[in-house]
Every structure is written in C-alpha cells, then in structure tokens.
C-alpha cells in the first residue's frame, strides 16, 4: 500500500484531521476528520505492506477481536482509496 496524495496529519481541538497538502489541495476539497482508530491506522499505514499487517498492529494496540479489526481496517482503507489517497 502506498500513499498517493500528500496529506498532513494534525490534531486540532481533540480531533484527528487529515489536511490535503501540495498538489492534493487541487484534487481534494476539504478536511478528513478521523476517529481514534482511523488515526491509528493512518499512523501505521506507511510501515504496512498489507491490510493484514495493519490488522495485526491493531490487535497489538487495542483490545479488539480480529473480525472487528479487519472490518475497521477494510472500511477505513476503502474510504482512502475512494478519495485516491492510497493505492
């Protein structure tokens, strides 16, 4: 998995936010507000080769079952793909 768009992660007023930077500003309109889980997935995304790598990191970090972690990862990555942020 590779991040295709330049995105800047920020925490503002307790919210986890992705802000388009560079040329991504031209392609994407607005900010992406993420849950704590989404922010965690974003933080490990650049180190992960597969969705399963991210799921395993979630299982290490959170008290969650594998099925829930898989669903959360699949949903979040699906949204990033929808907006062309990742491959």
Can you name each region flagged by the protein language model?
Residues 1-39, 43-46:
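Acidic, low-complexity/disordered tracts enriched in E/D and polar residues
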Residues 30-87:
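Long, charge-rich, low-complexity alpha-helical segments
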């Amino acid at each position: 998995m590779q991040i295709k768009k330049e995105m800047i992660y920020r925490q503002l007023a307790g919210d986890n936010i992705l802000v388009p930077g560079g040329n991504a500003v031209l392609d994407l309109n607005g900010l992406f507000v993420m849950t704590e889980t989404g922010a965690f997935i974003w933080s490990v995304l650049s180190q992960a080769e597969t969705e399963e790598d991210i799921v395993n990191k979630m299982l290490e970090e959170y008290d969650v079952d594998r099925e829930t972690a898989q669903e959360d990862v699949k949903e979040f990555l699906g949204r990033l793909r929808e907006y062309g942020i990742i491959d």
